[in-house]
């Protein structure tokens, strides 16, 4: 889950068009990747050699298990370096399929190396001391090797279901690419209400914002019927496959892979639902402020712009570096030093561009054992959400650096997605908070504080909506109560209302199911964001209560890799076993405190301060 889910996507067009207002344009950088490989030819030669080393290891006889495992571990470190390098090359030029094809090969190679290592662990004597640091990996390997009740059935189900699910995901993309989004011509500028959704949401012209909001939903609705067929068909196949393989429902299987179960998820969702009034209160506060600022009968599209007269600045890269570093001061000088080094333009560890060109619109860390961490951002607009994206990916990159410091096994660098993502979301929350704390103008403080609160809404409420909606769709298909686009609209409206939205006033929101990409591309993955967000907000809370102890716990877990069950690592982070409903209450308490601070800022702005 390295690619970050956000409320927004890159809003390059509008920011670059408005750059003179800010006085600074975003800067481009190319990362120096020679610390990974001198060039593509060197990478190819090293990859060929690694393939031969693995083949030799797999066929070698007379090697002690500990030595065989150590060799596989070293090979995995090399393989991760190839993966990082090729991921970067493929993203730099999305039109060149050669790096992407090589990346696919490397992913297969890394998987074979990992399987070889797990096989050694399974076969090692129970009392072998060298296996102690790999107890969690060994337990997974033993579980993985357990023969299913009907192995032939399992293989047959996978052989049929996997291609079908891939086809549904591709079909979703094809259908939405043909969606008919209204086009707008205004002041010599052409706007596409689909492509320019976020740019229109931030435009100072109220009529243009409204047209953009309504046009986006109109475009989604234009493909409502075929999208319903795709989603319902996908759910039917995925759920049937899970049940045939003895995993219960597809959502239950997803929860189990996270280290949770249906009852735990349901309890968490219910706890969030009990706070729906907090979300409604926040939304109403934004609407009241818009009304007091002179907007007649304000609507949702009137809450997405800064206060009149305030233009958020575009940060130069050194400013971004300093802000991100200041945001994480409580983690100590070592962490801050690594973060500054990563984000210092002079070190050429960031790969950023101001125009897309042939680049992928993606963002991810570039990290491998024995190599300096870097990061890639397809397009940096200089707008706030673009810089938050950099802070987020920097959190992922620093996680890789800390695992290297902690000598984490290359075989244990990847673990539970929701825990991995929580670390990066924590960095983005801190980045927003730092911008809020250092701002002086009340309008600037309100702008940055609202962005922090909106992020928390995303992590807590939107994630809950998505998890509940996906679970409910699977349940409805299983009991035959869902079968049409109208059914999906009605169900979506019910879920949104439960978590504080107003589909009665804004009926377009009932079409939200159409735009939930991960429901189609990675079924039952969205619930990971709920727990990532819950934990990230709690990390933000705890680092203020007891900074010294928190720093020790956090950096210890950050450096060890994924050598334990995720709930055990969360227990160490929090100082106690996670009680998810209680964490919901604690997170929402802080949310409401921050909302009160924003309310006070609104009062100052309405009195004319900061004008």
Predicted regions and their residues:
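Sec/Tat signal peptide C-region and signal peptidase I cleavage site
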Residues: 22-26
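Active-site recognition of the HExxH zinc-binding catalytic motif
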Residues: 246, 381-401, 424-425, 532
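Bacterial N-terminal signal peptides
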Residues: 9-20
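Post-HExxH zinc-binding segment in Zn-dependent metallohydrolases
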Residues: 414-444, 452-458, 532
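A well-structured
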Residues: 27-310, 323, 496, 564, ...
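Catalytic zinc-binding patch centered on the HExxH motif and its immediate surroundings
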Residues: 313-315, 348-372
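Short pre-active-site segment immediately N-terminal to the catalytic Zn-binding motif
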Residues: 312-316, 370, 374-390
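C-terminal, non-catalytic "cap/extension" segments appended to globular domains
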Residues: 38, 139-147, 259, 295, ...
């Amino acid at each position: 889950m390295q690619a970050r889910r956000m409320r927004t996507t890159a809003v390059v067009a509008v920011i670059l068009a408005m750059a003179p207002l800010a006085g600074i344009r975003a800067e481009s950088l190319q990362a120096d990747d020679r610390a990974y490989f001198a060039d593509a030819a060197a990478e190819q030669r090293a990859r060929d050699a690694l393939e031969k080393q693995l083949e030799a290891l797999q066929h070698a006889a007379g090697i002690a298990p500990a030595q065989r495992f150590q060799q596989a571990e070293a090979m995995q470190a090399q393989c991760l370096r190839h993966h990082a390098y090729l991921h970067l090359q493929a993203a730099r030029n999305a039109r060149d399929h050669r790096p992407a094809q090589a990346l696919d090969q490397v992913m297969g190679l890394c998987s074979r190396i990992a399987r070889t290592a797990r096989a050694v662990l399974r076969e090692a004597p129970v009392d072998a001391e060298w296996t102690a640091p790999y107890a969690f990996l060994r337990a997974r390997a033993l579980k993985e090797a357990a023969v299913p009740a009907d192995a032939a059935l399992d293989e047959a189900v996978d052989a049929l279901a996997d291609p079908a699910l891939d086809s549904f995901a591709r079909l979703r993309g094809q259908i939405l690419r043909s969606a008919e989004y209204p086009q707008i011509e205004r002041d010599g500028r052409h706007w596409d209400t689909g492509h320019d959704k976020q740019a229109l949401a931030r435009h100072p012209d109220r009529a243009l914002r409204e047209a953009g909001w309504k046009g986006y939903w109109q475009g989604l609705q234009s493909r409502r019927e075929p999208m319903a067929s795709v989603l319902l068909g996908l759910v039917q196949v995925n759920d049937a496959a899970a049940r045939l393989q003895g995993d219960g429902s597809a959502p239950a299987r997803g929860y189990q892979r996270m280290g949770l179960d249906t009852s735990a998820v349901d309890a968490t969702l219910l706890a969030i639902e009990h706070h729906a009034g907090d979300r409604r209160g926040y939304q109403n506060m934004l609407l009241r402020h818009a009304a007091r600022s002179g907007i007649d009968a304000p609507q949702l599209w009137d809450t997405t712009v800064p206060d009149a007269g305030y233009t958020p600045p575009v940060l130069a890269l050194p400013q971004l570096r300093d802000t991100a570093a200041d945001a994480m001061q409580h983690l100590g000088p070592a962490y801050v030093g690594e973060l500054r080094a990563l984000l210092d333009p002079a070190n050429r560890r960031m790969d950023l561009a101001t125009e897309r060109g042939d680049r992928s619109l993606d963002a991810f860390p570039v990290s491998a054992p024995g190599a300096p961490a870097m990061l890639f951002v397809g397009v940096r607009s200089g707008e706030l959400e673009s810089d938050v994206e950099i802070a987020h990916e920097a959190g992922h990159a620093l996680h890789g650096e800390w695992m290297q410091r902690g000598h984490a096994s290359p075989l244990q660098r990847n673990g539970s997605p929701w825990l991995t993502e929580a670390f990066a979301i924590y960095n983005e929350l801190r980045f927003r908070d730092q911008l809020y704390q250092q701002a002086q103008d009340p309008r600037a403080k309100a702008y940055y504080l609202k962005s922090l609160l909106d992020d928390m809404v995303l992590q807590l409420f939107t994630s809950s909506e998505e998890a509940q909606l996906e679970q409910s769709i699977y349940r409805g298909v299983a009991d035959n109560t869902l079968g049409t686009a109208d059914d999906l609209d009605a169900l979506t409206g019910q879920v949104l209302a439960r978590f504080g939205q107003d589909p009665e006033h804004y009926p377009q929101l009932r079409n939200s199911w159409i735009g939930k990409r991960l429901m189609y591309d990675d079924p039952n993955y969205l619930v990971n964001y709920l727990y990532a967000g819950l934990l990230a907000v709690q990390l933000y809370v705890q680092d203020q209560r007891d900074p010294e102890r928190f720093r020790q716990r956090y950096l210890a877990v950050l450096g060890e890799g994924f050598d334990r069950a995720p709930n055990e690592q969360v227990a160490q982070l929090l100082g106690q076993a996670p009680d998810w409903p209680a964490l919901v209450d604690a997170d929402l308490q802080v949310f409401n405190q921050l909302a009160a601070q924003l309310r006070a800022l609104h009062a100052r702005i309405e009195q004319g301060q900061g004008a």
